[in-house]
From Swiss-Prot:
Entry protein name: 4-hydroxy-3-methylbut-2-en-1-yl diphosphate synthase (flavodoxin)
SUPFAM superfamilies with a match to the protein in the record: Dihydropteroate synthetase-like, Nitrite and sulphite reductase 4Fe-4S domain-like
Gene (UniProt): ispG
GO molecular function: 4 iron, 4 sulfur cluster binding; 4-hydroxy-3-methylbut-2-en-1-yl diphosphate synthase activity (ferredoxin); 4-hydroxy-3-methylbut-2-enyl-diphosphate synthase activity (flavodoxin); iron ion binding
Catalytic reaction(s) noted: (2E)-4-hydroxy-3-methylbut-2-enyl diphosphate + oxidized [flavodoxin] + H2O + 2 H(+) = 2-C-methyl-D-erythritol 2,4-cyclic diphosphate + reduced [flavodoxin]
Organism: Ruegeria pomeroyi (strain ATCC 700808 / DSM 15171 / DSS-3) (Silicibacter pomeroyi)
Protein's job: Converts 2C-methyl-D-erythritol 2,4-cyclodiphosphate (ME-2,4cPP) into 1-hydroxy-2-methyl-2-(E)-butenyl 4-diphosphate.
The family this protein is said to belong to: Belongs to the IspG family.
InterPro entries in the cross-refs: Dihydropteroate_synth-like_sf, IspG_bac, IspG_bac-typ, NO2/SO3_Rdtase_4Fe4S_sf
Length: 375
């Protein structure tokens, strides 16, 4: 739960779920909602894949998924796992043996698709490998690849069909006394995804992996994911998320964190609050924010920064942020620290000065956290 006793209307009450482990990352229960992404390199290109995994981890990814379409990819996975700073999920479709090979290669989790993994006997083989090698499993239902008997029964991909697919495979895992699993019921349609996720959340206590599949490019996919995932998270549904974009995986991680930050569910780095700018702005807000986003990427400490072009809303927004800058006149503006007006600063020096103030505040917050942990 994101707890705010002063403003209870900001609280999000998370659905109670079992906790499993994906490598060293807890998923479900009271664990923080983890952020995932997926590589888009050829898995057999180990150097490129490892570089992408490391970049995603640096951006904050807790878990990274890698596709394992063939034997060569399964062989490459062993080295990728060895070089990865975060747990690796092996994405398995069609060939159940790839799941067995991925478990042997050290994958922390196996994603299997009920629509194409094959018979229950094949699933049992994957379960055995997962148990032997300490892997968890994600049952990854997708509207675009539902089982034939469910499409015949329901006529089209629908929430009921997706939930039934997921529950059928949960039963297979449970019948084999395997409980380290999570589930997803993804679709590219926001309405279908939301309804399916609500259905599966009511039907099981398994940890839920949230995603809108094939969401689109950076802008359209971000909007679709923010609406779909944001609404479900606000309802308390979701234990780990992956934003699917036709873009660099690092962008998926950034968008994922922004969605969580907007709901107060997880915080990482500087949350910049800025105005869209208008004729009243005392400096170029858009260019300033673009520059600050790049200059402050290295800050991992959760904190807030307001950049407002004029005094209409600037002082009020600054009251609620760690550092703030409000445009004034005559080529300068007011710097706010801890919600209070502190000193004036010229527009010319403003960006460098704000970076200094943010770094100073981040260091102070880190020191306070370290001291508290040492008590």
């Amino acid at each position: 739960m994101s707890h705010n006793p002063v403003r209870p209307w900001r609280n999000v009450y998370r659905r109670k779920s079992r906790q499993i482990m994906v490598g060293n990352v807890p998923v479900g229960g009271d664990a923080p909602i983890s952020v995932q992404t997926m590589t888009n390199t050829l898995t057999t290109d180990v150097a490129a894949t490892v570089a992408q995994v490391q970049a995603a981890a640096e951006a904050g990814a807790d878990i990274v998924r890698v596709s394992v379409p063939d034997e060569a990819s399964a062989r490459a996975l062993r080295e990728i796992v060895r070089e990865s700073p975060v747990p690796i999920v092996a994405d398995i479709h069609f060939h159940y043996r790839r799941g067995i090979e991925a478990a042997e290669a050290g994958a922390a989790c196996l994603r299997i698709n009920p629509g194409n993994i094959g018979s229950p006997d094949r699933v049992r083989e994957v379960i055995r490998a997962a148990r032997d090698h300490g892997c968890s499993i994600r049952i990854g239902v997708n509207a675009g690849s539902l089982e034939k008997h469910l499409l015949e029964k329901y006529g089209e991909p629908c929430p009921e069909a997706m939930v039934e697919s997921g529950l059928e495979h949960i039963r297979i895992l449970q019948d084999n006394d395997f409980h380290e699993y999570k589930i997803s019921v993804k679709a590219s349609d926001v309405f279908l995804s939301a309804a399916a996720y609500q259905g599966i959340a009511e039907a099981t206590d398994a940890p839920i992996h949230l995603g809108i599949t094939e969401a689109g490019g950076l802008v359209s996919g971000t909007i679709k994911s923010a609406i779909g995932l944001g609404n479900l998270l606000w309802m308390g549904i979701g234990d780990t998320i992956r934003v699917s974009l036709s873009a660099d995986p690092v962008e998926e991680v950034k968008v994922g964190y922004e969605i969580l930050k907007s709901l107060g569910l997880r915080h990482r780095g500087v949350n910049i609050i800025s105005c869209p700018s208008c004729a009243r702005q005392g400096f170029d807000v858009i260019k300033t924010v673009e520059a600050l986003e790049k200059r402050l990427e290295h800050i991992k400490t959760p904190m807030s920064l307001s950049i407002i072009g004029c005094v209409v809303n600037g002082p009020g927004e600054a009251l609620m942020t760690d550092v703030g800058f409000t445009g004034g006149g005559a080529g300068s503006g007011m710097v706010y620290l801890a919600g209070k007006a502190s000193h004036k600063m010229s527009n010319e020096r403003m960006i460098d000065h704000i970076v200094e103030e943010v770094e100073k505040k981040a260091a102070a917050l880190d020191a306070a956290s370290a001291a508290e942990a040492a008590e």
